[in-house]
């Protein structure tokens, strides 16, 4: 039976944290048997904001090493770097010419990012949803895992595909969203009102996958809760709800079992056990990470790019011909 193709992209712009893992990467690992997967390190997206070239290069390899340590299997899935497939920006230019300024000006992420970095706003930042559409459409993707913050961009991608097919002839598969029901939003430890983020400045905001046990214990001790002292899954109590959600995702226990276990215990006891569950969950990832060599990473990326290029080339050539380009 033909497996549906899934395209997933991740930027190499900072350390991978628990929110990335529980919200995306863990699901990617679990769906490798069910789908044909292409995992792409979207490094061209990373240059829409100021970034040191040496850091970008090292972070790209670092990210691949972590993805492998988390369980991405290059024998099952394609894993490659965006900039190694030339058709990504080439198709993006063709798509640029099919999208109105009005559609682009409605993109909320551009507004948010430009407010945070007003001195660094460039055309690439404004335009990157088109490159994202190119990433997806190049591979005739059936499904795209998206969080809440990327839904608008996938909708734009779908609109672009439908418009192109209507105006020039059938070329692109119109992708559907693949939204994880659980774990899609892990919030910051220091501020449970905001999503856990690589770019947040707080020292105790995020748990990173390579954090040492003593660092994890320290961060969890300082994690925000409330003054009620009752351990229960209540979405209105953002701090304890976030910690319980993390515990549930790492332990695979039901909310009922967790509440029963901590019924007569305080936040200190719960945080101590949460830190231990976290340490044990991250231990095998950290051990595998240490075993992966730079040469192994480069060989896997070469193989992934070799798999991706023919797919991308076929789509780009068809789009080019349909538009009358020689």
Curated annotation (Swiss-Prot):
GO terms for biological process: tryptophanyl-tRNA aminoacylation. A motif ('HIGH' region) lies at residues 12-20. GO terms for molecular function: ATP binding; tryptophan-tRNA ligase activity. This is Tryptophan--tRNA ligase. It is found in: Cytoplasm. Keywords: Aminoacyl-tRNA synthetase, ATP-binding, Cytoplasm, Ligase, Nucleotide-binding, Protein biosynthesis. The gene is trpS. It catalyses: tRNA(Trp) + L-tryptophan + ATP = L-tryptophyl-tRNA(Trp) + AMP + diphosphate + H(+). SUPFAM superfamilies: Nucleotidylyl transferase. Catalyzes the attachment of tryptophan to tRNA(Trp). Its EC number is 6.1.1.2. ATP binds at residues 11-13, 19-20, 147-149, 186, 195-199. Belongs to the class-I aminoacyl-tRNA synthetase family. A motif ('KMSKS' region) lies at residues 195-199. It comes from the Bacteria. L-tryptophan binds at residue 135. The keyword Cytoplasm applies. InterPro entries: aa-tRNA-synth_I_CS, aa-tRNA-synth_Ic, Rossmann-like_a/b/a_fold, Trp-tRNA-ligase, Trp-tRNA-ligase_bac-type, Trp-tRNA_synthetase. Its main location: cytoplasm.
